[in-house]
Design a protein with these regions (language model features):
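Glycine-enriched loop-and-adjacent helix/strand subsegments that border the catalytic/binding cleft
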Residues: 22-65
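Active-site-proximal loop/helix of nucleotide/amide-processing enzymes and allied scaffolds
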Residues: 1-23, 59-63, 73-126
Length: 126
């Protein structure tokens, strides 16, 4: 039985999307800066669905500048779920120094939901 061909940047389960080289100029040390990165890079992708909650992990280099991202989960209008293993797997596969977990709220209300707080606790515990 033949093994599948190796394709850099992908596995059978994970696809990590590299960002433009100039995206590494983004300073992502504040929530506002991460929001700008989301709007300029992630939301600009043709496959982005702004009417659904989307969880994205952004991989960062040693200067905490983004160089890749992975859509962890696509949900509904009001919710999206993600497990720590789904979040950490692409981070480890990409060899990231650091990461930021981001998601949108289609409602436009940035207040964290109970589900947001619960996943934050689970990730901190992991």
């Amino acid at each position: 039985m033949k093994s599948p061909k190796y394709r850099p940047g992908t596995t059978n389960r994970i696809t990590v999307t590299s960002v433009r080289e100039d995206a590494c100029t983004y300073n992502t040390d504040t929530p506002e800066a991460l929001h700008r990165f989301w709007c300029d890079v992630i939301a600009a992708q043709p496959e982005h669905e702004p009417d659904k909650e989307t969880v994205v992990v952004v991989m960062m280099n040693a200067r905490l500048r983004p160089y890749a991202w992975h859509r962890v989960s696509l949900g509904s209008v009001s919710e999206c779920s993600a497990q720590p293993r789904e979040i950490f797997r692409p981070v480890i596969a990409a060899g990231a120094y650091g990461f930021a977990l981001t998601h949108n709220h289609p409602s436009g209300d940035p207040s964290p939901s109970r589900a947001d707080e619960a996943i934050t606790r689970r990730i901190n515990e992991a």
